[in-house]
UniProtKB/Swiss-Prot annotation:
<dbReference type="InterPro" id="IPR000049">
    <property type="entry name" value="ET-Flavoprotein_bsu_CS"/>
</dbReference>
<keyword id="KW-0285">Flavoprotein</keyword>
<comment type="function">
    <text>The electron transfer flavoprotein serves as a specific electron acceptor for other dehydrogenases. It transfers the electrons to the main respiratory chain via ETF-ubiquinone oxidoreductase (ETF dehydrogenase).</text>
</comment>
<dbReference type="InterPro" id="IPR012255">
    <property type="entry name" value="ETF_b"/>
</dbReference>
<dbReference type="InterPro" id="IPR014729">
    <property type="entry name" value="Rossmann-like_a/b/a_fold"/>
</dbReference>
<keyword id="KW-0249">Electron transport</keyword>
<keyword id="KW-0813">Transport</keyword>
<protein>
    <recommendedName>
        <fullName>Electron transfer flavoprotein subunit beta</fullName>
    </recommendedName>
</protein>
<comment type="subunit">
    <text>Heterodimer of an alpha and a beta subunit.</text>
</comment>
<comment type="similarity">
    <text>Belongs to the ETF beta-subunit/FixA family.</text>
</comment>
<dbReference type="GO" id="GO:0009055">
    <property type="term" value="F:electron transfer activity"/>
</dbReference>
<dbReference type="InterPro" id="IPR014730">
    <property type="entry name" value="ETF_a/b_N"/>
</dbReference>
<dbReference type="Pfam" id="PF01012">
    <property type="entry name" value="ETF"/>
</dbReference>
<dbReference type="InterPro" id="IPR033948">
    <property type="entry name" value="ETF_beta_N"/>
</dbReference>
<keyword id="KW-0274">FAD</keyword>
Length: 249
C-alpha cells in the first residue's frame, strides 16, 4: 500500500506571532518555522502503518516555497521514503492547495492519503474534505484511530458526545485529530539519512493546475488587548465587584 502524507510549513507553535504594520498579514521575518503539528501526527500514523507491514511506501508532499523542503526533510527523517514539493510562493487558499494535491494524487495513485485535520496558521479545516470531493475518494475526518483491514480502512472519529467508527473503501482520505497518536522525534542518524532520500520539486504549471485565488485577505488584526485580572480575598468581595464594577449580576 502506498500512503501519501501532506505536510505544511507553518510558524512554530511556540512563537508569538506579530501582525504587519499595514495589517496585510503576519510578519514572518526571522520567525522560526516548523511542520504543522497535525501534519506531524499524519506522518507518524503513516510510519506506524509501515512498521506494521501495512504500508509499503510513504510519500510526503508539501505545497509552498522552496523553504518548505526543510519540513519535507523532517518528514523523511521521521520515516517517509521520498518527498515531493509543489513549489509556489503565492498565498494559496484551501481549494488551490486541494487542486494541487489532487494532481499529485492522480500521478502517484496512493491507496491512502493522510492529512492533518487543519493547519494552526489558518485553522480552515477544509483541504482534506475538498481533496476528497475532487478525487471522489471516501473520507474519514477527525480520526482518533485508524485501522486498515483488507480493502477498507476503519476510522474512529471524535464527535460531540462520543465516538463514531466508519468503514471507508480504499482508496480513501483520512484527516488526523490530536489524540490519534504521539509523534516521535527524528534521531540524528535518520536526519542524516534523510538528506540522501529523493525530494522532487514540481510547479503548479507542470501539474497543469491554476492557483488563481477566489479569496482575498482584506485585513489581519491582532487580538484586542485584555486588562490583567485581579485577586480577591473573599466571595463577598467577588460578588461586590461582579455586581458594582463588572455589572454582570
Amino acid at each position: 500500500m502506498k500512503v501519501l502524507v501532506a505536510v505544511k510549513r507553518v510558524v512554530d507553535y511556540n512563537v508569538k506571532v506579530r501582525v504587519k504594520a499595514d495589517n496585510s498579514g503576519v510578519d514572518l521575518a526571522n520567525v522560526k518555522m516548523s511542520m504543522n503539528p497535525f501534519c506531524e501526527i499524519a506522518v507518524e500514523e503513516a510510519v506506524r502503518l509501515k512498521e506494521k507491514g501495512v504500508a509499503t511506501e510513504i510519500v510526503a508532499v508539501s505545497v509552498g516555497p522552496t523553504a518548505a523542503q526543510e519540513q519535507l526533510r523532517t518528514a523523511l527523517a521521521l520515516g517517509a521514503d521520498r518527498a515531493i514539493l509543489v513549489e509556489s510562493n503565492d498565498e494559496l487558499n484551501s481549494l488551490a492547495v486541494a487542486k494541487l494535491l489532487k494532481a499529485v494524487v492522480d500521478k502517484e495513485q496512493p491507496q491512502l492519503v493522510i492529512l492533518g485535520k487543519q493547519a494552526i496558521d489558518s485553522d480552515n479545516n477544509q483541504t482534506g474534505q475538498m481533496l476528497a470531493a475532487l478525487t471522489g475518494y471516501a473520507q474519514g475526518t477527525f480520526a482518533s484511530k485508524v485501522e486498515v483491514a483488507g480493502d477498507k480502512v476503519n476510522v474512529t472519529r471524535e464527535i460531540d458526545g462520543g465516538l463514531q467508527t466508519v468503514a471507508l473503501n480504499l482508496p480513501a482520505i483520512v484527516t488526523t485529530d490530536l489524540r490519534l497518536n504521539e509523534p516521535r522525534y527524528a534521531s540524528l542518524p535518520n536526519i542524516m539519512k534523510a538528506k540522501k532520500k529523493p525530494l522532487d520539486v514540481v510547479t503548479p504549471d507542470a501539474l497543469g493546475v491554476s492557483t488563481a485565488s477566489t479569496v482575498k485577505t482584506l485585513k489581519v488584526e491582532a487580538p484586542a488587548a485584555r486588562s490583567a485580572g485581579i485577586k480577591v480575598k473573599s466571595v463577598a468581595e467577588l460578588v461586590e465587584k461582579l455586581k458594582n464594577e463588572a455589572k454582570v449580576i
